Amino acid sequence: MEHITAQDYIKRLQTAMERNSRGPREIEACCEYAGRLLDARLPVLFDAAHVQSVLRLKEIDWNQAYHVFPISQGVKTRTVTAPSLPLKTRQRWILTEILPRFEVSPRAHGFEPGRSIKTNAELHAGHEYALCLDIHDFFPSIRKESVIRVFLEAGYSRGASSALAEVCCFKKALPQGAPTSPRLSNIIFKELDERLEAMAKRRGITYSRYADDLTFSSHGGMGNILREVERLLRPQGFLLNEEKVHFYGPGVPKRITGLIVQNGSVRVPKEYKRRLKQEIYYCKKYGVLTHLENTGSKKFVHYREYLYGKAYYIHMIEPEVGNIYLEELDQIRWPGFFAGEC
């Protein structure tokens, strides 16, 4: 794609509009509008028709735009709304070209560069008390009008903002499986993050958020913070999941975003490491294929990647421990198709 400066873009725009016999006021207004977006390092999109043209939205079959399916999580299921490949491509364009220009709260640790479940949990290491909360139906609770406001605040027209929001939403809310949803949720939740942090700070409490997981910790008690959190969330359309309220007192291991926080350190749960160790043991003792046949595993095709993924996850949290598991996996005699030899 040809790279042109903002000044060149404005000149070309002005020339094109003059050729099409546009009036001076309209030309001036369009050039000023484009200039503001270019100064903000945003792509120029004038209205809904322009968004449709640039993103080639007519090529999308909107009747087949999403695939909705459940994913098992223990005894419960979570509904994923996955966009079709053509729609996902457009959403990724919005994610890379528009959404990085927005600021999010430093307390938001999910889906942000340099932040992770580890950095989220580390904030609370060494604290005696912790309260972990979960927002019910987080993405579906973020409505289309909130997404429109994101693009309006960026400087886009109402028409362009509505069209961009339409690409990012499903049934007038953020879908669980769209690549734009995590970043949009962090942008939209920024004000609430700041209010929650300020409320917690006044009480000497540390606050962080990873997607829909809210964590508060302190060296003292929590007081009535649960009620205060609900008071801040409810007017914005967010409700807490009452079944996922976890309070931890002194001397108790704290499970924060799936990790164990205890004695000032952050670790992967023992049961997670134990299961991986067990699978490695059986692969070495019986061979990979025999082990999979004995267990009736459905992970047959990507089993090697599955195990290495677990080891790299451990390595991200506990590098030295993760290295041990990676070395153990390297010692397994993988069949040719697992090792990429065919």
Where are these regions (language model features)?
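A short, basic-hydrophobic beta/loop patch
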Residues: 162
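Catalytic palm active-site di-aspartate
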Residues: 132-136, 177, 181, 200-218
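Right-hand nucleic-acid polymerase module
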Residues: 1-71, 79-133, 138-154, 165-171, ...
